[in-house]
Amino acid sequence: MAKMIAFDEEARRGLERGMNRLADAVKVTLGPKGRNVVLANKFGLPTITNDGVSIAREIELENSYERIGAELVKEVAKKTNDVAGDGTTTATILAQALVREGLRNVAAGANPLGLKKGIEVAVERVSEELSKQAKEVETKEQIASTASISAGDSAIGGLIAEALDKVGKEGVVTVEESNTFGLELELTEGMRFDKGYISPYFVTDADRQEAVLDDPYILIVNSKIAAVKDLLPLLEKVMQTSKPLVIISEDVEGEALATLVVNKIRGTFKSVAVKAPGFGDRRKAILGDIAILTGGQVISEDVGLKLESTSLDLLGRARKIVVTKDETTVVEGSGDPDQIAGRVSQIRNEIDKSDSDYDREKLQERLAKLAGGVAVIKVGAATEVELKEKKHRIEDAVSNAKAAVEEGIVAGGGVALLQASITAFEKLDLSGDEATGANIVRLALEAPIKQIAFNSGLEGGVVVDKVRNLPTGHGLNAATGEYVDLIATGIIDPAKVTRSALQNAASIAGLFLTTEAVVANTPEYAEADAANVDAAMRSQGF
């Protein structure tokens, strides 16, 4: 495959053009008066959004060098979204400002490596200053404020604050589409996992299509159950207590399932069988969590326990279990609080030691189900386009609120970055190109507040000069045009989001500045690749 190669200024300027085209599309969304961007979908309705990373993902440029530049900036938005869940537009604007100022200095003869070093030192100092400025989230109102700013809607912010208040720091907040109009918050006490009843014959509430069992025994098995003779001794013991039975296992099939269903239909014995969530080692771990939460044991031959010899004291208990076709909720398990606390501590240690983002996410879910709870925000809207846009905003706002709880809050509206730079640069002792690199950061930190001002119809330079002379935490309320105490007014950003945006932008800027050559596909090969992808998708029926 033939390639094109560009060197020096030509290479860097090609990358910069791609970055500018992407950043210019993203930055119009920043601030309370930011605009939306409409994204065309090849299949289905267009999407309307103000989310930086969603816009960035959709941008594909024709020019090969520009495409690479855009991809590098996409990485800034994606990384910030992965780490903090929000702040993608701010990260993109910072990256653009750092690269623009940096390339200007490289063209004037500055050493790119010296500039990169100066940028890294300055960003580290500003990040430290942001951490010092951060105030711990103490009230539900502060969570509501930060979520409201992210979502652009105070009703959404209030609902998210209520959800986090109910489930706690470790809890799970999920967003689901609803057939009804408006917003609804559904709270779950205890543990919920994504597996429902094996057979609809287990349903006890026909209207709601749920199996609701009060004060049941819970049998937790790390294998399939097929032979009724293995299960019969335990069934007889449970029937003598007149309590219902919940079976959570890899699967229940054959005559064992038939026996349970027949007894349920006849009214002889109430039970429900549920498939265990997860696969392999993760399934074992989740079954262990359920056992500890309910005060039972996992019946497994690995630990010398056989189903046919299982006694009642090896079964778990809960106040109530609700099973739908898709999920199971365990309410108020009877586990020992000390054992649950020990399990929570163990999972936290595993999270700290894990190198995999996927493993960390799954461990976090397990932790939330044990230590917190589950809140589901159900979203409804008049049209599918509006529904998707609203759901996306709420998901961003949930991430934003969680980040605020994690590392605290700073003044919003781009003010925290600007004011952190004033203090950070007082103590900076650099010279030559490193000092120039630090100055590039100082100028770039003005970019977010200037863009917010511009999107609000104000002059950015005037706003920056005014904010520089205000007390820490005071700045422009772009929604009203007034200069106020931003934290007191509820115009706040999570420190984690602001810090991540700056650090990721600086990382990519350093790569831009130290690039001396770009190797790219020739246009005809790029078009052929795109055509091949289209043909492959058509052949699959897309």
From Swiss-Prot:
MF-aspect GO terms: ATP binding; ATP-dependent protein folding chaperone; isomerase activity; unfolded protein binding
For this protein, the record's InterPro entries field holds: Chaperonin_Cpn60_CS (IPR018370), Cpn60/GroEL (IPR001844), Cpn60/GroEL/TCP-1 (IPR002423), GroEL-like_apical_dom_sf (IPR027409), GROEL-like_equatorial_sf (IPR027413), TCP-1-like_intermed_sf (IPR027410)
Cellular component per GO, a single term = cytoplasm
The processes (GO biological process) annotated in the record are:
protein refolding
Keyword Repeat in the entry? The reply is no
What are the record keywords, sorted? ATP-binding, Chaperone, Cytoplasm, Isomerase, Nucleotide-binding
Question: Would the keyword ATP-binding be found if you checked this record's keyword annotation?
Answer: yes
Q: SUPFAM superfamilies, from UniProt? A: GroEL apical domain-like, GroEL equatorial domain-like, GroEL-intermediate domain like
- Documented EC number(s): 5.6.1.7
Q: Which Pfam families does the annotation name?
A: Cpn60_TCP1
Q: Which PROSITE patterns match?
A: CHAPERONINS_CPN60
What subcellular locations does the record give? Cytoplasm
Major subcellular site:
cytoplasm
Q: Which reaction does it catalyse?
A: ATP + H2O + a folded polypeptide = ADP + phosphate + an unfolded polypeptide
Q: Which residues bind ATP?
A: 29-32, 86-90, 413, 477-479, 493
Q: What is the recorded function of this protein according to its Swiss-Prot or TrEMBL entry? A: Together with its co-chaperonin GroES, plays an essential role in assisting protein folding. The GroEL-GroES system forms a nano-cage that allows encapsulation of the non-native substrate proteins and provides a physical environment optimized to promote and accelerate protein folding.
User: Do you know which HAMAP family this protein is assigned to?
Assistant: CH60
Sequence similarity: Belongs to the chaperonin (HSP60) family.
Subunit structure comment from the entry: Forms a cylinder of 14 subunits composed of two heptameric rings stacked back-to-back. Interacts with the co-chaperonin GroES.
Q: What is this protein called?
A: Chaperonin GroEL 3
